[in-house]
């Protein structure tokens, strides 16, 4: 997770009656652990960076478990709140992600050793994710909770895979094609297993020479998958070409536009977003709105404009249940998203900051009130 405000990527799913509501919890709001009080109920189960359960939903907070969360570098949690009784947040994706995360070290090791079975295992691990994304229902995707912990390779690969799947769904991919995209995105950085760990984990900015070494990882990834065999060209090209840029200034081959595989063009957007959203030793992470603007600004240069447009229509900036401050001096909670307006949700206001007092709740649709903007996440 990240340390500052507006931290994490989040996915909230508004599910139709045709989809199981397993994992959907009511009465939830997002709270920074630094502001977490005792005697409140955890609304969503919390996992560590190895995918292990730390605190189960329904647990009451205490000084001890709050300290435990801080020790495990958890910075944001969801707690129950009756003011948001009609706002449902789905945590099924967390379980799917956790199950996949547990398998990732074994999958990468087996791939590097040429074990064909590991490729099938990787596909099987993504099946639940693809089934989830392909399910019927309206999907509202917020840029807050894909990334639950500080950046490391396995988390980054899974988050990139999740984002890529949602983009693929927006682009009309069927389930079979989504599975191929998912495996390509999941394995896009497998070539980093051939790069020295001290370079991958360096606590500082890379030198020019070190960056040249790092740039070999797409080629190493292609070699690993070619040696494995049995994977389609689109899957391999997604791994090999994910650092190519739409204008031809990327690497390793300097491809441009449609010469870059569509899988790679999708993965490129997701890879950059998840990478800049992570804290680094040499720079602070981008807030979700900043990372979002970076993707939009790269349209036509770094990224395929048509995919950026799909990105814009697919991902929202502020999560359901987030407490936000508005430019008119009022604060409240995000209760609904507005499609095609990712930074202008519907907010249920509850507090007058200027007067320093609660107010009778009412809702503001920021699409209709263009003179009001979100100025921060509280």
Q: What positions do the PLM features span?
A:
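Short, contiguous strand/loop micro-motifs
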Residues: 51-54, 151, 208, 250
């Amino acid at each position: 997770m990240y340390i500052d405000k507006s931290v994490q990527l989040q996915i909230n799913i508004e599910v139709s009656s045709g989809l199981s509501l397993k994992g959907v919890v009511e009465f939830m709001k997002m709270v920074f652990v630094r502001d977490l009080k005792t005697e409140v109920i955890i609304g969503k189960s919390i996992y560590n960076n190895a995918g292990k359960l730390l605190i189960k939903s329904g647990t009451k907070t205490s000084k001890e478990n709050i300290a435990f969360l801080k020790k495990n570098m958890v910075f944001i949690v969801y707690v129950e709140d009756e003011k948001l009784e009609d706002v449902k947040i789905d945590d099924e994706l967390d379980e799917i992600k956790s199950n996949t995360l547990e398998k990732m070290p074994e999958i990468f090791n087996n791939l590097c050793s040429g074990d064909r079975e590991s490729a099938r295992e990787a596909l099987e691990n993504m099946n639940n994710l693809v089934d989830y994304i392909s399910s019927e229902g309206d999907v509202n995707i917020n840029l807050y909770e894909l990334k639950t912990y500080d950046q490391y390779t396995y988390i980054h690969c899974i988050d990139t895979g999740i984002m890529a799947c949602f983009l693929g769904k927006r682009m009309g991919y069927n389930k079979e094609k989504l599975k191929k995209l998912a495996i390509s995105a999941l394995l896009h950085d497998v070539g980093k297993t051939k790069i020295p760990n001290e370079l991958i984990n360096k606590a500082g900015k890379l030198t020019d020479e070190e960056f040249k070494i790092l740039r070999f990882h797409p080629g190493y990834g292609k070699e690993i998958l070619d040696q494995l065999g049995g994977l389609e060209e689109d899957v391999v090209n997604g791994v090999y070409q994910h650092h190519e840029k739409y204008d031809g200034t990327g690497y390793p081959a300097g491809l441009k536009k449609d010469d870059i595989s569509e899988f790679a063009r999708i993965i490129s957007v997701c890879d950059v977003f998840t990478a800049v959203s992570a804290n680094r030793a040499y720079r602070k992470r981008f807030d979700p709105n900043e990372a979002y603007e970076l993707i939009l600004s790269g349209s036509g240069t770094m990224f395929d404009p048509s995919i950026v447009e799909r990105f814009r229509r697919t991902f929202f900036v502020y999560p359901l249940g987030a407490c936000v401050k508005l430019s008119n001096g009022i604060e409240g909670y995000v209760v609904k998203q507005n499609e095609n307006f990712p930074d202008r949700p519907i907010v249920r206001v509850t507090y007058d900051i200027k007067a320093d007092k609660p107010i009778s709740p009412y809702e503001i649709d920021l699409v209709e009130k263009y003179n009001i903007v979100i100025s921060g996440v509280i």
